[in-house]
Design a protein with these regions (language model features):
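Transmembrane signal-anchor helices characteristic of membrane glycosylation enzymes that use polyprenol
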Residues: 21-52, 59, 230-243
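Transmembrane-helix signature of polytopic, membrane-embedded enzymes
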Residues: 22-32, 115, 120-142
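Extracytosolic helix-loop segments that constitute the early lumenal/periplasmic catalytic or substrate-binding loops
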Residues: 35-38, 54-79, 83, 90-93
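Transmembrane-lumen/periplasm boundary regions of multi-pass, lipid-linked membrane glycan transferases
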Residues: 54-60, 186, 194, 199-290
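Juxtamembrane segments of multi-pass membrane glycosylation machinery
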Residues: 87-107
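Short acidic/glycine- and proline-prone juxtamembrane loop motifs at membrane-interface regions
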Residues: 106, 145-159
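Transmembrane-helix motifs of polytopic, lipid-linked glycan transferases
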Residues: 107-127, 165, 288
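Membrane-interface transmembrane helices that cradle and orient dolichyl/undecaprenyl
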Residues: 125-131, 166-183, 190-191
């Protein structure tokens, strides 16, 4: 007598499928980012000479209420505009009952880096679609050169957000031209008010040369740039005006500072770029040669 037994042996013995939902992946990414940002951010003395200038500016704001042109102890002329120092001083005042001034000021880095990662995620989502923002964020936090520097009191941390916001504006231009022009104006303002003219010029020159390409060579792009500059001037203009009114001689000294280093070291800068962009840059080159999911 034959017996026929139906048994799904393939289904029972097969490896279980990975079934992590989008929310779970997002939660893992948030936890990883939180650990990456806050590990090593506080609990140590100021690093010298990396943090000396920023701490001097922050103390100048806290102790002397000098919000317009706080100068560092080693330099009478403010090397950087006051945006980064202002937020550092604000966090220091807010958290001073619980943390040392330098530790409390470093908490502002968490704000800048979070905003940077948000802008990178929005940029990648705009170019590649939903779900790719996390990947870009992982590439960003994997960059070796950022590990120490995001925990350092330096205005370049705020400039990262300005760059991310400006690049997001370019990616948004074709879908939302007016909104992207406002975002670009804000990004340029963050760059100028945190790190000075060089980062501002890098984005401005990029925007100028984009106008020579067929996709950007039109009247709408000219209006986009005009609105961006108008927004930018409306933000940085009041600070420049107040700086000139409060101390005209110091303002002239600041304006007449050399823009570029008199002895630039090309290979040193190239090594720095390679260090800070590893492994994000090789991965970006690999993705550039691959078709975008939006094109499929």
């Amino acid at each position: 007598m034959k017996h026929h037994l139906d048994h799904d042996w393939q289904g029972n013995m097969a490896s279980p499928r990975k079934n992590l939902g989008e929310k779970t992946k997002l939660h893992f990414f948030f936890i990883l980012s939180f650990v990456w940002i806050f590990t090593g951010l506080i609990g140590h003395e100021p690093w010298r000479p990396l943090e000396s200038a920023s701490i001097s500016q922050i103390l100048e704001i806290i102790q002397n209420n000098q919000f317009i042109h706080p100068a560092s102890a080693s330099n009478d002329v403010p090397y950087y505009p006051p945006l980064y120092a202002f937020f550092g001083a604000s966090f220091a005042k807010l958290l001073s009952p619980f943390l040392e001034i330098h530790d409390a000021a470093r908490i502002s880095n968490a704000m800048w880096i979070s905003l940077t990662m948000l802008s990178i995620g929005l940029l990648t989502r705009e170019l590649w679609g939903i779900g790719f923002g996390r990947s870009a964020g992982l590439f960003f936090i994997a960059s070796i050169g950022l590990i120490v520097n995001i925990h350092t009191l330096t205005p370049e941390v705020a400039a990262l957000f300005g760059f991310g916001l400006s690049l997001y504006a370019f990616s948004l231009y074709f879908r939302r031209p007016f909104r992207s022009s406002v975002i670009l104006g804000i990004g340029l303002s963050v760059l100028f008010l945190s790190n000075g003219i060089i980062p501002f010029l890098s984005i401005f020159i990029t925007a100028f040369f984009l106008g020579f390409f067929s996709f950007w060579k039109n009247k709408r792009y000219a209006i986009f740039l005009a609105i961006s500059l108008l927004v930018n001037l409306s933000i940085i203009g009041p600070w420049l005006f107040l700086f000139n009114i409060s101390d005209p001689s110091l303002f002239q000294l600041w304006i007449n500072q050399p823009i570029l280093n008199s002895t630039p070291n090309f290979w040193y800068n190239l090594q720095g770029i390679a260090w800070f962009s590893w492994p994000a840059f090789p991965l970006a080159c690999l993705l550039y040669t691959s078709p975008s999911p939006r094109d499929s």
